Amino acid sequence: ACKDGFPTATCQHAKLVGNCKNSQKYRANCAKTCGPC
């Protein structure tokens, strides 16, 4: 059930700049890239 709602590049950038930790929006929409799936 883990998938990225945003494009992969967007999610990888979000991970790089720390948005996975800081932004609920990115956690939700980049679950595959950000999260422990």
UniProtKB/Swiss-Prot annotation:
Signal peptide: none annotated. Keywords: Disulfide bond, Ion channel impairing toxin, Nematocyst, Neurotoxin, Potassium channel impairing toxin, Secreted, Toxin, Voltage-gated potassium channel impairing toxin. It comes from the Eukaryota. Residues 25-26 are annotated as: Crucial for binding to potassium channels. Its main location: secreted. Residues 2-37 form the ShKT domain. GO terms for biological process: envenomation resulting in negative regulation of voltage-gated potassium channel activity in another organism. GO terms for molecular function: potassium channel inhibitor activity; toxin activity. GO terms for cellular component: extracellular region; nematocyst. SUPFAM superfamilies: Crisp domain-like. It is found in: Secreted; Nematocyst. The record marks 6, 13, 23 as: Important for binding to potassium channels. Disulfide bonds join 2-37, 11-30, 20-34. No cytolytic activity on erythrocytes detected. Not active on rat KCNA4/Kv1.4 or KCNA5/Kv1.5 channels. Inhibits voltage-gated potassium channels (IC(50)=14.42 nM for rKCNA1/Kv1.1, IC(50)=80.4 nM for rKCNA2/Kv1.2, IC(50)=7.76 nM for rKCNA6/Kv1.6, IC(50)=13.12 nM for hKCNA3/Kv1.3, and IC(50)=49.14 nM for insect Shaker IR). Binds the Shaker IR channels in a voltage-independent manner. Belongs to the sea anemone type 1 potassium channel toxin family. Type 1b subfamily. This is Kappa-actitoxin-Bcs3b. It comes from Bunodosoma caissarum.
